[in-house]
C-alpha cells in the first residue's frame, strides 16, 4: 500500500515483417506503457506510421465532427457491432453528406431568423409612431428624422434654429418623428439643428405602407422560420437516433486503428528491424510473453530488461531482471531507449483505500520512488472529519451523498470522491453515536446510552456543555498533531535515506522529527511544572509524563535542533520554532471546528425547540470515555422538544411553542439552519482536515509528479471483432 506496484521494463525486438502482428498482440494484451524512442540507438530512427494512418486519422476527425454536430452522447449507443472497412467508406460518407445538408439548412434558417428579428427590432419603433413608412422619406425639400429623445428639447432646438423655417413633431409612446422645412436649400439643416440635443436617430426601413402591417408580416415570417428550424431539429434528432450507434462504434474502431498505425512512431526502427520498449507490472510479464509468442511464435525476442527499484539515485535506479524470457529473433536489438526513462505509477491500494487516491491526486500522483500516503489519508481524514462534525444525522446524510456520487457519475474521480464522502459520513455517524447526538439533539444519549445501556451520559462530549471536554480536546488535538506529523517525518526520512543516504535523511527529516517530538513530549511532561510551571494544566488532561521523560524529550529536541542547523544552516535554526511547535499547534483547529459546529447546531435547536438549564443541587461526578475520564457536572441543559414545560431556567422558549406562526417560522429555521450546518461541515471541517493533510502532513515528505500508467490498448465499449 505504501509503494506502487512494481514495474518491469520490457523490450520486444524483431523483423519488420512481423511488425503488424506484434502491434496487434501488444495492443490486445493492453499491458505495456510504451516508452518513446529518443534516437539513442546507433543506426535506428523513429519508425514511420503504418499504411492507412493518415486516412484513418482523417476519418476519425470526420466522425468526431459529426458526433459534435449531431450531439451524440454515450447514452445514444446501441448494441456492439462490427464496423467494416466498407462501412467506413460508404456509410460514413452517406451520413456525412446528409448530416452536413441538414446542418447547412439549419444554419441558413438561423441566419434568416436572425435577420428577420433584426428587422422587427428596427421596425417596431415606427409602428409605435404610427406613420406609414413611405411618408417618412423621399421628399425633395422636406427633411425627416425619426428616433427617440426629449421632445421638448427637440422643439426648442428647432424653434431656435434660423436654418429651419417650419417644423412639426409627431410622437408615439417612445418614438418621435420630426418634419422640418429648411430656410434655404440646406440639406444639413435638420441634422445640424439636432446636434447636442438628446436624440437618437433611427434608420427608416426600406418598406411601404403601415408599419404595423410590416411588423406583423415580419413576425409571421419569424414564426414560419422558427417552425422550419424545429422541423430540421426533429430531422436531426431522428437522424442522430438512427446513426448514433454507428458513429460511436466507428469512432472507437478508427481510434484503435490510429493508435495501432501510429505506434511505430514510438519504436526504434530500421528498414529491416524494430525495437519497442515499455513498462508493465512485473506480475504480468509472463502473461505478456505468452501473448506475444502465441501471436508470432519465435519471430521476436521478448526480454525483461529490468525491474524498477524503489530507490532513486539521481534518476530512477533499475535493477536487472532475475531472468529473461528468451526467444529467437530475426535480427533486433535490446539496447535501452533512455536510461532516465521512469516507470509509470500504479497505486497499489485495496478497494476501500483506493477511493482516497482522488485526494492524493489533487496534489499529484506519487512518484514511483516515494511513499504513497493514500493509506494514511484513509486512516486519518475520515477520522478528523468525523471527530469535528460528530453527529449521527449529518453522518447519514454525508454517507448518502457519497453513495449517490459514487453511483451516479461515470467520472472515476467523482466516483472516488463519493467513496471518500461515504467514509467521512460513516465516521461522522460513528462519532455522533459516541457524542450521543443526532442533528445536535441528545436523542442518542437519551435512548441509547442512558435509556438502553443505563449510562449517566454519552461516552464523549463535544465540550459545549461539559467544559472539561473542551480542554481535553484542545490538548488531544496537539497529541493528534504530534502523531500525524511524526508519520510524515518518518516517511520523509525513508524517502530521503533511499534517495540521498542516511546522513542527509538524518539532517533533514530526522532532525525535524526529533525537534518536534522532543518538544511535544516535554510539553506533556511535568518537568519544571511543580508549583505552577510554564504550561497550562489542561495539557495534563490527556497525559502527564514524568519529569525524566520530559528531560529526555528536551535532550532529543536539542539533538534535533543541532541536526537541523547542520543540515539547513542559519535558515534551519531560524525555522526551528516552526518545526518544534508551530506545526503542532496548527492541529488545535480540530478542537476549534468541533466546538464551532456544535455551537451552530445548538443555536438552531435552541431557536426552534427552546431549552432550559438545571443547576444541580449536588454536583455529580460522571465517568466518560468508558471510565477513562471523569469530570464533575454542576448544571445540565435540556431541549424542550415535545412541550414548552421547563424544569429550570429557560434559556429561550422556542419558536415551536409560540403558536402557529412560530411553528411555521420554526420549521423554516430548522430546515435552513441544519442545511447550513451541513454545508458548512464540508467547507469548514472538510477544508480544515484537508489543510492538515496537505499543508502539515504532505509537506514533510511528499513531492509527487509520477506518470500515470497508460497501457497501449483500448477498452472496447461499442465494437466487437467477433
Swiss-Prot record:
<feature type="region of interest" description="Disordered">
    <location>
        <begin position="309"/>
        <end position="352"/>
    </location>
</feature>
<keyword id="KW-0813">Transport</keyword>
<dbReference type="GO" id="GO:0046961">
    <property type="term" value="F:proton-transporting ATPase activity, rotational mechanism"/>
</dbReference>
<dbReference type="GO" id="GO:0051117">
    <property type="term" value="F:ATPase binding"/>
</dbReference>
<feature type="transmembrane region" description="Helical">
    <location>
        <begin position="662"/>
        <end position="682"/>
    </location>
</feature>
<feature type="compositionally biased region" description="Low complexity">
    <location>
        <begin position="326"/>
        <end position="335"/>
    </location>
</feature>
<feature type="transmembrane region" description="Helical">
    <location>
        <begin position="419"/>
        <end position="439"/>
    </location>
</feature>
<keyword id="KW-1133">Transmembrane helix</keyword>
<feature type="transmembrane region" description="Helical">
    <location>
        <begin position="384"/>
        <end position="404"/>
    </location>
</feature>
<comment type="subunit">
    <text>Has multiple subunits with at least A(3), B(3), C, D, E, F, H, I and proteolipid K(x).</text>
</comment>
<dbReference type="GO" id="GO:0005886">
    <property type="term" value="C:plasma membrane"/>
</dbReference>
<feature type="transmembrane region" description="Helical">
    <location>
        <begin position="639"/>
        <end position="659"/>
    </location>
</feature>
<dbReference type="GO" id="GO:0007035">
    <property type="term" value="P:vacuolar acidification"/>
</dbReference>
<dbReference type="GO" id="GO:0033179">
    <property type="term" value="C:proton-transporting V-type ATPase, V0 domain"/>
</dbReference>
<feature type="transmembrane region" description="Helical">
    <location>
        <begin position="474"/>
        <end position="494"/>
    </location>
</feature>
<comment type="similarity">
    <text>Belongs to the V-ATPase 116 kDa subunit family.</text>
</comment>
<feature type="transmembrane region" description="Helical">
    <location>
        <begin position="590"/>
        <end position="610"/>
    </location>
</feature>
<comment type="function">
    <text>Component of the A-type ATP synthase that produces ATP from ADP in the presence of a proton gradient across the membrane.</text>
</comment>
<keyword id="KW-1003">Cell membrane</keyword>
<protein>
    <recommendedName>
        <fullName>A-type ATP synthase subunit I</fullName>
    </recommendedName>
</protein>
<feature type="transmembrane region" description="Helical">
    <location>
        <begin position="554"/>
        <end position="574"/>
    </location>
</feature>
<feature type="transmembrane region" description="Helical">
    <location>
        <begin position="505"/>
        <end position="525"/>
    </location>
</feature>
<dbReference type="InterPro" id="IPR002490">
    <property type="entry name" value="V-ATPase_116kDa_su"/>
</dbReference>
<dbReference type="GO" id="GO:0016471">
    <property type="term" value="C:vacuolar proton-transporting V-type ATPase complex"/>
</dbReference>
<keyword id="KW-0812">Transmembrane</keyword>
<keyword id="KW-0406">Ion transport</keyword>
<feature type="compositionally biased region" description="Basic and acidic residues">
    <location>
        <begin position="309"/>
        <end position="321"/>
    </location>
</feature>
<dbReference type="Pfam" id="PF01496">
    <property type="entry name" value="V_ATPase_I"/>
</dbReference>
<keyword id="KW-0472">Membrane</keyword>
<keyword id="KW-0375">Hydrogen ion transport</keyword>
Amino acid at each position: 500500500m505504501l509503494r506502487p506496484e512494481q514495474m518491469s521494463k520490457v523490450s520486444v525486438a524483431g523483423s519488420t515483417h512481423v511488425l503488424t502482428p506484434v502491434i496487434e498482440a501488444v495492443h490486445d494484451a493492453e499491458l505495456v506503457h510504451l516508452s518513446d524512442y529518443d534516437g539513442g540507438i546507433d543506426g535506428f530512427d523513429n519508425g514511420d506510421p503504418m499504411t492507412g494512418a493518415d486516412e484513418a486519422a482523417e476519418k476519425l476527425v470526420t466522425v468526431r465532427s459529426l458526433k459534435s454536430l449531431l450531439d451524440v452522447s454515450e447514452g445514444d449507443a446501441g448494441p456492439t457491432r462490427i464496423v467494416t472497412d466498407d462501412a467506413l467508406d460508404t456509410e460514413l460518407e452517406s451520413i456525412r453528406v446528409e448530416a452536413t445538408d441538414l446542418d447547412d439548412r439549419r444554419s441558413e434558417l438561423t441566419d434568416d431568423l436572425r435577420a428577420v428579428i433584426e428587422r422587427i427590432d428596427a421596425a417596431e419603433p415606427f409602428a409605435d409612431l404610427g406613420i406609414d413608412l413611405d411618408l417618412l422619406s423621399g421628399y425633395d425639400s422636406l427633411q425627416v428624422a425619426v428616433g427617440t429623445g426629449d421632445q421638448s428639447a427637440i422643439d426648442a432646438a428647432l424653434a431656435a434654429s434660423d436654418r429651419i423655417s417650419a417644423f412639426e413633431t409627431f410622437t408615439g409612446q417612445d418614438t418621435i418623428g420630426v418634419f422640418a422645412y429648411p430656410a434655404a436649400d440646406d440639406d444639413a439643416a435638420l441634422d445640424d439643428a439636432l446636434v447636442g440635443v438628446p436624440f437618437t436617430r433611427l434608420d427608416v426601413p426600406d418598406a411601404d405602407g403601415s408599419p404595423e402591417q410590416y411588423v406583423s408580416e415580419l413576425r409571421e415570417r419569424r414564426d414560419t422560420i422558427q417552425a422550419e428550424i424545429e422541423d430540421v431539429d426533429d430531422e436531426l434528432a431522428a437522424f442522430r437516433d438512427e446513426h448514433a450507434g454507428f458513429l460511436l462504434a466507428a469512432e472507437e474502431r478508427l481510434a484503435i486503428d490510429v493508435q495501432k498505425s501510429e505506434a511505430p512512431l514510438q519504436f526504434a526502427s530500421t528498414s529491416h528491424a524494430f525495437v519497442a520498449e515499455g513498462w508493465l507490472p512485473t506480475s504480468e510479464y509472463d502473461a505478456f510473453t505468452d501473448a506475444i509468442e502465441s501471436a508470432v511464435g519465435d519471430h521476436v525476442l521478448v526480454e525483461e530488461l529490468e525491474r524498477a527499484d524503489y530507490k532513486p539515485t539521481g534518476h530512477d535506479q533499475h535493477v536487472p531482471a532475475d531472468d529473461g524470457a528468451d526467444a529467437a529473433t530475426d535480427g533486433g536489438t535490446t539496447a535501452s531507449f533512455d536510461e532516465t526513462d521512469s516507470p509509470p505509477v500504479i497505486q497499489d491500494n485495496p478497494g476501500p483505500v483506493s477511493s482516497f487516491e482522488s485526494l492524493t491526486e489533487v496534489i499529484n500522483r506519487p512518484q514511483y520512488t516515494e511513499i504513497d500516503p493514500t493509506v494514511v489519508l484513509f486512516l486519518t481524514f475520515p477520522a478528523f472529519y468525523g471527530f469535528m462534525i460528530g453527529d449521527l444525522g449529518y453522518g447519514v446524510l454525508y454517507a448518502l451523498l457519497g453513495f449517490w456520487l459514487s453511483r451516479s457519475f461515470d467520472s472515476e474521480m467523482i466516483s472516488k470522491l463519493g467513496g471518500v464522502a461515504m467514509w467521512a459520513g460513516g465516521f461522522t455517524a460513528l462519532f455522533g453515536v459516541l457524542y450521543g447526538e443526532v442533528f445536535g439533539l441528545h436523542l442518542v444519549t437519551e435512548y441509547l446510552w442512558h435509556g438502553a445501556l443505563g449510562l449517566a451520559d454519552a461516552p464523549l462530549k463535544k465540550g459545549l456543555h461539559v467544559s472539561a471536554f473542551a480542554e481535553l480536546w484542545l490538548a488531544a488535538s496537539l497529541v493528534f498533531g504530534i502523531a500525524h506529523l511524526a508519520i510524515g517525518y518518518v516517511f520523509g526520512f525513508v524517502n530521503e535515506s533511499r534517495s540521498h543516504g542516511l546522513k542527509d535523511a538524518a539532517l533533514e527529516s530526522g532532525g525535524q522529527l526529533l525537534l518536534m517530538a522532543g518538544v511535544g513530549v516535554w510539553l506533556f511532561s511535568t518537568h519544571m511544572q511543580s508549583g505552577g510551571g510554564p504550561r497550562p494544566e489542561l495539557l495534563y488532561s490527556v497525559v502527564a509524563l514524568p519529569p525524566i521523560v520530559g528531560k529526555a524529550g528536551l535532550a532529543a529536541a536539542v539533538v534535533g535542533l543541532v541536526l537541523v542547523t547542520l543540515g539547513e544552516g542559519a535558515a534551519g535554526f531560524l525555522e526551528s520554532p516552526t518545526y518544534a511547535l508551530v506545526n503542532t499547534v496548527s492541529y488545535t483547529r480540530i478542537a476549534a471546528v468541533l466546538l464551532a459546529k456544535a455551537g451552530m447546531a445548538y443555536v438552531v435547536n435552541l431557536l426552534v425547540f427552546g431549552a432550559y438549564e438545571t443547576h444541580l443541587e449536588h454536583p455529580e461526578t460522571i465517568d466518560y470515555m468508558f471510565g477513562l475520564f471523569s469530570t464533575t457536572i454542576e448544571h445540565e441543559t435540556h431541549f424542550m422538544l415535545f412541550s414548552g414545560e421547563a424544569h429550570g431556567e429557560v434559556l429561550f422558549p422556542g419558536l415551536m411553542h409560540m403558536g402557529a406562526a412560530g411553528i411555521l417560522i420554526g420549521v423554516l429555521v430548522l430546515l435552513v439552519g441544519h442545511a447550513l450546518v451541513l454545508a458548512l461541515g464540508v467547507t469548514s471541517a472538510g477544508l480544515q482536515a484537508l489543510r492538515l493533510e496537505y499543508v502539515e502532513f504532505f509537506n514533510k515528505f511528499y513531492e509527487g509528479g509520477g506518470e500515470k500508467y497508460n497501457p497501449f490498448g483500448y477498452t472496447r465499449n461499442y465494437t466487437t471483432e467477433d
